[in-house]
């Protein structure tokens, strides 16, 4: 159920993705883009379900039980799953030492970032009783990686904006019956929802979905999947920095070490890809 004054989690997902998808689709119609191509709609719907419903839904569900640090650590394993599941690119990725070392170093950086919290995670969260939730969260991370790779290897004939809109609409529609089955509407009092909750929803629609997720889908089309996957390492860094800047939180030595380790790993992964592109450019010139 929702926290006092907030929207229930799955209803929030339904509103967020449905509204964001319809707004983005409206923009595509305004630009007179092709939107009703059956093959692309099906492909986008599959991607949307894997990314925004299964993966994102599992994160929403898990956060009701697991500590946020544990969720962040498990979600940050996504780049590793990208490499393991991207079979067409195994010959390239598994032979690229910079990419492999970068992924390992990046995950180590995330562990350093949360090192001061890791020790008490199991004790604070009930230990082995949370194992099913942890496994479920790993499944969600695998779903995100699989959905991203499905999108990458099944290119659409429509624009990234149209594809993103269909993905969000598909996920938003599926969230609705889940919210109803969980009884979220039975306990909802719209008048008791705080203004801050509505503002948070507006932020998620405009920036979290229309801006950020659209950028993610576009990047999958134009950049290697291993590069795009490093967002999972960068997100915790941004969260810590925002906490320091806007919430007045302090940053420890180990957190600072983790930040630089993560940034170094992302640089290593991207530098390897950049050098490869430069070599290819020289050969073709």
Question: What residues fall within each predicted segment?
Answer:
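Transmembrane alpha-helical segments that form core, pore/gating elements
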Residues: 24, 82-84, 88-90, 121-185, ...
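C-terminal-most transmembrane helix of multi-pass membrane proteins
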Residues: 10-13, 17, 196-199, 233-285
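Membrane-interface helix-cap regions at the ends of transmembrane helices
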Residues: 1, 19-38, 107-127, 170-196, ...
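Helix-helix packing/entry segments at the starts of transmembrane helices
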Residues: 14-15, 52, 56, 71-77, ...
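Specific transmembrane alpha-helical segments of multi-pass solute transporters/efflux pumps
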Residues: 25-75, 111-112, 205-223
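Hydrophobic transmembrane alpha-helices of multi-pass small-molecule transport proteins
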Residues: 24, 45, 77, 95-117, ...
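Juxtamembrane helix-entry segments on the extracytoplasmic side of multipass membrane proteins
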Residues: 5-10, 14, 36-42, 100, ...
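Hydrophobic/aromatic residues within transmembrane alpha-helices
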Residues: 2, 12, 16, 62, ...
């Amino acid at each position: 159920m929702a926290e006092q004054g907030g929207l229930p989690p799955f209803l929030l997902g339904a509103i967020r993705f449905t509204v964001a998808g319809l707004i983005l689709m409206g923009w595509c119609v305004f630009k007179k883009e092709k939107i009703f191509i059956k093959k692309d709609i099906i492909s986008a719907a599959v991607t949307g379900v894997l990314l925004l419903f299964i993966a994102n839904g599992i994160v929403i569900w898990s956060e009701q039980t697991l500590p946020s640090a544990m969720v962040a650590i498990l979600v940050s394993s996504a780049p590793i799953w990208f490499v393991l599941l991207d079979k067409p690119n195994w010959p390239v990725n598994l032979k690229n030492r910079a990419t492999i070392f970068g992924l390992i170093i990046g995950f180590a950086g995330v562990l350093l970032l949360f090192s001061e919290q890791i020790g008490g995670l199991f004790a604070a969260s009930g230990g082995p009783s949370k194992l099913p939730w942890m496994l479920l969260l790993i499944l969600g991370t695998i779903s995100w990686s699989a959905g991203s790779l499905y999108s990458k290897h099944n290119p659409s004939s429509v624009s990234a904006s149209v594809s993103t809109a269909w993905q969000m609409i598909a996920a938003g529609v599926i969230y609705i019956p889940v919210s109803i089955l969980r009884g979220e509407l039975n306990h909802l009092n719209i008048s008791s929802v705080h203004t801050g909750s509505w503002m948070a929803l507006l932020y998620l629609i405009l920036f979290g979905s229309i801006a950020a997720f659209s950028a993610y889908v576009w990047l999958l089309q134009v950049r290697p999947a291993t590069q795009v996957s490093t967002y999972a390492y960068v997100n915790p860094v941004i969260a810590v920095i925002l906490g320091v800047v806007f919430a007045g939180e302090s940053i420890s030595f180990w957190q600072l070490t983790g930040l630089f380790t993560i940034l170094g790993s992302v640089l290593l992964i991207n530098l390897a890809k950049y050098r490869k592109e430069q070599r290819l450019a020289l050969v073709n010139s």
